[in-house]
Amino acid sequence: MTHFDKPTYTVRKTRKKEIPQGVYTKDPVSGEAVFTKDIADNQMVVPASGHHFPIGARERLGYLLDPGSFVESNIEVRSADPLQFVDSAPYPARIKKYEKESGLPEAVVTGAGKIHGVPVSLAVMDFRFCGGTLGSAAGEKITRAIETAIAQKIPCIIFSTSGGARMQEGILSLMQMAKTSAALGRLAAARLPYISVLTHPTTGGVSASYATLGDVILAEPGALIGFAGPRVIKDTTKQTLPPGFQTSEFLLKHGLIDQIVPRTEMRERLHQILLALYVKQTPASASVAKS
């Protein structure tokens, strides 16, 4: 071969190893790829950074309650369309879309169950259904969960995640703030404990009513909690907001919540609180807790 000869190359084709979709999930805190299975096995919390991914209402109930103890109630309560509201789509069409996306008939799941044998009435919100907004059906279900606690003389626990009142129902949605708060007043008069757990995000009319009326208020780490969002406040006040404004850590520092509890510790922490506020204070409940 001379200096002017064109060299020949052999191209060897190799098959690129493809990683199946869904094996890894990016951690928003560290930016690293984490095995999805490791996150799922840790209640959708990244083991290293502690980042809490959103979960559905039924998943949360599965993490919290004794196996087989949950009995769902108020399944028949559904959203109506009293205002015949239409924006880019009719309200009933939106409801059907939310039902399909979330697998739920409404933004909250209610029922009764047990935590280490202690009976409780629960309402657990799900952000996937219309952003967890509070409408007349959701408000009715939450009120009934509180009334169940009163009737059965058991504690009430509400997990909140919401964008606020549901605009498609107008004043009927706003009325649920007063309705649920009044029911909690009756629960307090019956001297029964109410534990409120705030998860990301809890805003608007929900944060301004039952979410912040608990005898004990817990929150998951890093949750956004407030009435108006930080962008709206910044645009309105024309001021720079402090770091971490409206996070659960900020609220704990300023005395607006009682504890921050990681999801993986929530079941045990709730049990401790129930023992202090209910079992030890109510002699008749001790035998129920052991059953």
From Swiss-Prot:
Q: Which InterPro entries does the entry mention?
A: AcCoA_carboxyl_beta, Acetyl_CoA_COase_Trfase_b_su, ClpP/crotonase-like_dom_sf, COA_CT_N
Q: What is its EC number?
A: 2.1.3.15
The family database entries (PROSITE patterns) matched by this protein are listed as: COA_CT_NTER
Record bears the keyword Membrane: no
Q: Which cell locations does it reside in?
A: Cytoplasm
> Pfam family of this protein, just one?
Carboxyl_trans
- Record has Lipid metabolism as a keyword: yes
Q: Which family does it belong to?
A: Belongs to the AccD/PCCB family.
Tell me the subunit arrangement: Acetyl-CoA carboxylase is a heterohexamer composed of biotin carboxyl carrier protein (AccB), biotin carboxylase (AccC) and two subunits each of ACCase subunit alpha (AccA) and ACCase subunit beta (AccD).
> In UniProt terms, what function does this protein have?
Component of the acetyl coenzyme A carboxylase (ACC) complex. Biotin carboxylase (BC) catalyzes the carboxylation of biotin on its carrier protein (BCCP) and then the CO(2) group is transferred by the transcarboxylase to acetyl-CoA to form malonyl-CoA.
Protein name in UniProt: Acetyl-coenzyme A carboxylase carboxyl transferase subunit beta
